Amino acid sequence: MSDMRLIVAGAGGRMGRTLIHALHEADGAALVGALEAPGSELLGQDSGLLAGLGPNGIPVSADLWSLSKDADGIIDFTVPAATIANVAIAAERGIVHVIGTTGLSASDNAVIKSVTSRAIVVQSGNMSLGVNLLAALVKQVAKSLDEDFDIEILEMHHRAKIDAPSGTAYLLGQAAADGRGVPLEEKSVRSRDGFTGARGRGDIGFATLRGGTVTGEHSVIFAGPYERIELTHRAEDRMIFARGAVKAACWARGRKPGLYSMADVLGLGSQS
């Protein structure tokens, strides 16, 4: 089979540049388009030079419709508004859409789900093998321990991250809620300030830290009577997310239309 031809959305961002590197090194996949927002000062620049590689002859463009004419898929780590705009075009073109964008609202996710009857979408708050294995472990531990064990999720990222809690924190929270058989939206506690009263039994708490250049750290804490279990993942390089996203795109090629997760890609079974 020929290389999968991929577009990188948000080509000038941290993840976009890392994805261009990943595709430069990848077997079975190749970069054919680099997408940025209309009006970006990066438009027209060589995407290889932008990523710190040599020139690759692929200029940054704002026209996804034209780029997608000769592509098999798009990898999208952007912002919610851009991702939702890209969803419609990717579905119309019939190309795979890998979504790593975080901070999506319930209505955004509804839009994404609405196209999956005719489009192939892989969506995850985290594309790394380690985090998705962690989510599977969290689900199992939450299922095994009753509400005598309180669940808290602690995450830390670099100072420039604009959404909180992280998409990975939500993924882990969902895994914990699934293990307990409860709706996350009813049990999640995302802020504590002032006189909050005692912790609610069965709550799933989230705590957020921001600072420095931290790529990503997540811990899920099960705090029980006189003992505590902590499951932790530390990301040391964004390349783990980029390689996971490329793997997801290649895996999705030729699949039936639908909404898939990294658990599907990695053969871990459904986490929902």
From Swiss-Prot:
It is found in: Cytoplasm. (S)-2,3,4,5-tetrahydrodipicolinate binds at residues 158, 167-168. GO terms for cellular component: cytosol. NAD(+) binds at residues 10-15, 36, 100-102, 124-127. It comes from the Bacteria. The active site is at 157 (proton donor/acceptor), 161 (proton donor). Keywords: Amino-acid biosynthesis, Cytoplasm, Diaminopimelate biosynthesis, Lysine biosynthesis, NAD, NADP, Oxidoreductase. SUPFAM superfamilies: Glyceraldehyde-3-phosphate dehydrogenase-like, C-terminal domain (SSF55347), NAD(P)-binding Rossmann-fold domains (SSF51735). Catalyzes the conversion of 4-hydroxy-tetrahydrodipicolinate (HTPA) to tetrahydrodipicolinate. This is 4-hydroxy-tetrahydrodipicolinate reductase. It comes from Afipia carboxidovorans (strain ATCC 49405 / DSM 1227 / KCTC 32145 / OM5). The lineage of its organism: Bacteria, Pseudomonadati, Pseudomonadota, Alphaproteobacteria, Hyphomicrobiales.
